[in-house]
Amino acid sequence: MSTSEILNLNPQGVWKYFHELNQIPRPTGQMEEVTKFVMDFGKSLNLETRQDKTGNVLIKKPASKGYESGKTIIIQSHLDMVPQKNADVIHDFSRDPI
């Protein structure tokens, strides 16, 4: 899928960040750049953003007005990727975006 096709998917804001994230090589053990990307993302939205001792990134968003007594939602994800490719494909996951 081309960049323009990705950026024209809806909702466009989600796919914009998906595309930016996929420009960052991030095999296991090489997560500095993707960690910075996610930390900067949280901070750019003025959200409480921190990294714990083990390297996890935590972003906290307060409840929307009127929903303060609602249940808490947690979204969890890995920042790294386990690279896989066919033997005949030339791709360096430590430096090439996907």
State each model region's role.
Residues N8, L45, N86-D88:
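Intrinsically disordered, low-complexity boundary segments flanking structured domains
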